[in-house]
Amino acid sequence: MIPKNMESFLNEHLPKATFKARLKKDQGKCYLEFSNLDVHLLSHLGIISDKVGPHLVACIWDEESPLEIGGYVVVDSLAGGRPSMGGIRMLPNISPSDIHNLARGMTLKNAAANLPYGGGKAGIVAERSLSAERHTKIVRGFAKLIRRYKNIYLPGPDVGTNDADMKSIAIENGLDNALSKPADMGGNRIDELGAAAGGVIIALQTPLKIMPRLRILPQFVNLEIPNIENLTILIQGFGAVGAHASRILKERLPEVKVIGISDLEGYLYNESGLPIGELFKLWKENKLVTNIYFKNQIISEGYKHPTKFSTNADNLLLEHAFCFIPAAPIFNYLCVRSSENPSMTVDRMGKWSVIIEGANTYSPDPYRKTARIRMEQIVYREKGVMIANDYLVNSGGVIFAAQEHIVKTPDHLQIPEEMLGNSEAVNRWLKDHTNEFAELSKQRLIAGQEY
């Protein structure tokens, strides 16, 4: 059945005549498709088309499933190459405009990384509290829906999905129709490796070398770059990007202090540095860490404990540090106006010297672009904070994932057509070719490292 949140959204934003004229059905699978020529209808969905795209916006659901299975696919542009490439986000209130924003970010990111792919994205409308079994069933149902677009859209993981979900999609649609699969499928498993986070840390190391040149600009004349042992970091969003970023940072630059992190349940701050090893282990086990760490370590000592905990995650952005890394799925972490509902307004933000955008923040929406320009004028031009844009710095994940398509799967390893959709048969196939898939995974990992 169509997800209730999705059904409410579509009924509210699209004329009834559109359903009659545009709805396509295929054995219970339902498709509402729009191109960038459908300017008026796209505007109803909150999407403003331009010279770049979108190439395709599809609202898709399975009306015959007893589960709520549905969501959106946006192929923004194929100008950079075919197919488009981008992850599948899984959240309860995801909208077509959200997916379009992310797809445009992928267009720019893939182009900036010189990858021969267009930009795309998908979103599954589903609760985050699903059981593992129900989650997998919904992902596999969604895989059947997006099979229609396999020639123009290549999915990977994003917020709410992971490498195991990409295996589920590959079981349904074939090895070459999902990215970031586990190693037993020859995949590059970007979530497990923390590939996106690795790019963020490289992006931090580079500005450290070039930032002294900024002192010729009036807003940076008093810029102070601390010694490495005095370098401090705040990370908004201790998740797939943020948690791995902290881990990789401590491996490459162990002297650097991560002094603040946040997640959905709050934030932790310690000016002497947080125990990243312990927090990363907690994240691997529980996904949310701030409240658990508070209960296990802080509550017994109260205010005497050197680490501060707050249930207001956004207030992390009040703290001071040399570098701030937004890594939460929030477009507007900073804005000038409180009416734009940011994590923090620029007049209240902490004192930082550089922002490395680990999260996807780009939006083609003209109103959001205007808000972004207002923010940058104050943060960069007035406050003297360097901003490293998301599509330039967080491309590590797509670079590694793309190798699964660039380094081709040999024909003899392709899952036979008659096995697709049969988990047991596919797993037997993988087991029978264990060594070859392991070697393929190794080749793709090396290719990503050398790219």
Which residues does each predicted region cover?
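General beta-strand structural signal in soluble alpha/beta enzymes
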Residues: Y153-P157, A178-S180, G260-D263, I325-P326, ...
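Adenosine-phosphate binding glycine-rich loop
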Residues: I2-F9, R348-Y451
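Conserved active-site and cofactor/substrate-binding residues in soluble primary-metabolism enzymes
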Residues: I94-D98, E133, K137, T161-A164, ...
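Glycine-rich phosphate/diphosphate-binding loop of Rossmann-like nucleotide-binding domains
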Residues: D191-H320
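Rossmann-like adenosine-cofactor binding region
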Residues: G266-Y269, L274-I387
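Glycine/serine-rich phosphate-binding loop and adjoining beta1-alpha1 elements at the start
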Residues: G70, M90-L91, T107-L231
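N-terminal functional module of multi-domain proteins
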Residues: L41-Y117, K121-I124, G141-F142
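Short, Gly/Pro- and small/polar-rich lid/capping loops
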Residues: I2-I60
